Amino acid sequence: CLVNPRACNETLLNYNPTDNPKSVAVVGAGPAGLAYATVAAERGHRVTLFDASAEVGGQFNLAKQVPGKEEFHETIRYYKKQLEKLGVNVKLNTRVDADTIAAGNFDHTMVATGIVPRQPNIPGIDHPMVMGYIDAINGTRPIGKKVAVIGAGGIGFDVTDTITHDGPSAAVDIDVFAKEWGVDFENHPRGGVTGVEPVVAKADREVWLMQRKETKVGRGLGKTTGWTHRL
């Protein structure tokens, strides 16, 4: 499971109550920080969770905006409820330094600050027309009609899917789902499959997805239903 390491390991990984409660600081409220904070609190430790942003979730807040991945909203909702239920002291809009940790007199500090987007050292990378994936997914900057996406890994595919999609996502709109997959819920044809070409709402944009490897694009992606949609 993406968020529950105990799934299928219930007899191997147990969160037993601690005999020696500690004061714990967790820096970063992304997936790793949320998991650590909730488990530590569940075991009986006193946990303070810091994050520089205004909400918990880290890069899950990007993932939930990708068409078909809206279920990450529920993951974040679950963790918010767990933080409240377990009494974790959450401090948002807070940048942490050594003085912050020292002032809190914590017994342990867990650093879960995630990653910094890689910026390749190539000519023109600082041009105003160039943006990172965070701006592209959040829609904080305008995106042109012709786009080159450098990198064909999971993030490259997510960015491409996001900027080429138009309208509601099939994951949250039944009518859109039926059109994209060519399904007739009235079961007029056999099996409920309409027999027509699926209709996918596409943005008026051309995208070139680039990678350095000579292998087929997408070959390194996990073989899961999350990547079954053809761009």
Q: Each predicted region: which residue ranges?
A:
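Iron-sulfur cluster-binding cysteine motifs and their immediate structural context
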Residues: 2-6, 48-55, 61, 121
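Gly/Ser-rich helix-loop-strand patches that form or flank binding pockets
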Residues: 130
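N-terminal Rossmann-like NAD(P) cofactor-binding module of classical short-chain dehydrogenase/reductase
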Residues: 110
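Cysteine-cluster motifs in flexible loop/terminal segments that predominantly coordinate metals
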Residues: 1-21
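Generic secondary-structure signature for well-ordered alpha-helical cores
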Residues: 3-6, 84, 88, 168
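Rossmann-like dinucleotide/flavin-binding elements
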Residues: 18-52, 91-102, 113-122, 126, ...
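A short, flexible beta-alpha/helix-coil linker loop
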Residues: 8, 62, 213-217
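N-terminal Rossmann-like dinucleotide/flavin-binding domain of flavoprotein oxidoreductases
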Residues: 58-106, 218-231
